[in-house]
Amino acid sequence: MIVKYVQPDRSGIQAHNFTRHSIGYVVRGKKCVYYGDVCHEIPQGTLFYMGMGNHYTEDVPEQGKNFEQIVFYYTSDQLSRILNHLSVGYQLNITNDHSCPNCENQSHVSYPASNIMKNFFGTVNQYLKDDAFSQDNTAETIKMTELIYLILAQKDCC
């Protein structure tokens, strides 16, 4: 599922219980993720991942402009199918050798989006405006596959 969220006003910290994983992009404003008293800011132009479970977040609009984000929600099964397709269909060598304390100890990860990612989310934004995904699961799966490929193809951010 691909969704665009637009938040015109600051509404404070909200609790979310995600039943799916999510990869998102902050189009405008900033997102704050809270762990106890610690706030992690995710600024405009940043890609983020949030795992399943409870999250405490706040979406902060820019001065006079809406907060905007685009989020891809997916299950572990969907990700498995996409990774299998990329591995078998395109002989992509997929490994999980990334390891750093920042990524392992949190249920979210964020990093600045590359120009390719910004262009990708710009295209997705236009597709959402044109309502291209509402009745077309194939288009949504293709975009999700493209997103996963782009993430795998870039260098580690840490």
Language-model regions, residue ranges each:
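N-terminal regulatory/effector-sensing and dimerization cores
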Residues: 2-99, 133
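An amphipathic alpha-helical interaction segment
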Residues: 103-158
